[in-house]
Amino acid sequence: MSSPIIIRAPKKQPPEPPCLISLLPEEIVVDIVARVPRCYYPTLSQVSRRFRSLVASPEIYKRRSFFGCTEQCLYIAISKDQTSDIHWFTLCRKPNGQQFSGTTASDHRLVHIPTLPPMPMHGSYVGIGSNIFVMGGFCNWKITSSVSLIDCRTHTAQTLPNMPKAVAFPVTELIDRKIYVIGGSDTLSPMKSPSRIMMVYDTDTEMWQLRARPDWEAGKKWFSSVVIGGKIYMRTYHNSFVCDPNDTSCDRDEVLHSKEWWSACVIDDVLYYYDVRENCLRAYDPKQRAWGVVKGFEGLLPVACKWSKTVSYTGGKLVLFLQKTEKTEIWCAEIAVERREGGEIWGKVEWCNVVLSGNFHIMDCVAVVL
């Protein structure tokens, strides 16, 4: 007689315990997420609709500011061929990315922000807090006086009242929450008919003020500018100037102009720019009125580059963007700089890798606080 077949019922799996954080009050969850570094927000947004909505809400950034957990973030204005409209990207930093080791690279990359509309070419891009002001430029091949405000917390844009005058290619700098728009072209040619006025926008009162522009390099185009100690350092093909916007005084600086500085940034009152011809990072100290070369990372950056962009970053660092001459790749490096005994400035490459592939051109880099 055959043995009976015994069929065992499958064991019931215990139900998944509820996520503890989902049991907490909403305000507690907001306070917890506000303390999480932003590099983890893309991962959090994939957990649930609740988290996706939370990390995109203005409230989370208000709490980050309240707790002192804000971070500096980089937004990059990019054109496809230097003739099309501007599209905005942000530098996305992967958590726990590998540090630069000579052969391996981290997974940092430039990510397109699709919710922002195209912006005018060759305008002014100024970051204040969590916002970016976009002023003037070319729109449909016409000079525009339009002003837009980008809210980097929500990646939305709104239109503000126009500038008093339409210009492109101006010198634009921020001093004491006032945006100085100096010169620029009022025709389709960047080299002709430079504007002879200076427009000042008070971001607190939201009012424009027109000032007569001194006859600095009449008929010339300004190529680069930075702010050091409340003064604007500007360069044309022929001269470099140090200008005080309060009394409109302007003095030539022949030592500063001895190098073809371009797309510079400032860290601790020292000007930095990357010399693509000599493949080196140069530093200008206005107190000593002397140029130097940053040491310590020779051979660690791409060579044969056709352009560079630098932007200052938190904690005594700068971010450098490079494009190699024969490749359609944008490289990015984060470099920590320090002044050592004897006055020499040394740099350390924290990481360096390709962040965007394709025939793109970086028009400007803007740092905001989120």
Swiss-Prot record:
Q: Which Gene3D superfamilies match?
A: Kelch-type beta propeller (2.120.10.80)
Q: Where in the cell is it found?
A: Nucleus
The biological pathway it contributes to is: Protein modification; protein ubiquitination
The UniProt entry annotates Kelch repeats at: 131-177, 178-230, 263-315
Statement: the UniProt record of this protein carries the keyword Nucleus: yes
The protein's predominant localisation is nucleus
Q: What domain of life is recorded for the organism?
A: Eukaryota
Cysteine pairings via disulfide bonds? none
**Keywords for this entry?**
Kelch repeat, Nucleus, Repeat, Ubl conjugation pathway
**Which biological processes are named by the entry's GO terms?**
protein ubiquitination
Sequence intervals crossing the membrane: none
Annotated F-box domain ranges read: 18-64
Keyword ATP-binding assigned to the entry: answer is: no
One cellular component term (GO) for this entry is: nucleus
Query: What's the domain remark here?
Result: The F-box is necessary for the interaction with ASK proteins.
Note the subunit structure.
Part of a SCF (ASK-cullin-F-box) protein ligase complex. Interacts with SKP1A/ASK1, SKP1B/ASK2, ASK11, ASK13 and ASK18.
Q: What does this protein do?
A: Component of SCF(ASK-cullin-F-box) E3 ubiquitin ligase complexes, which may mediate the ubiquitination and subsequent proteasomal degradation of target proteins.
**What's the protein name?**
F-box/kelch-repeat protein At4g38940
Q: Organism source for this protein?
A: Arabidopsis thaliana
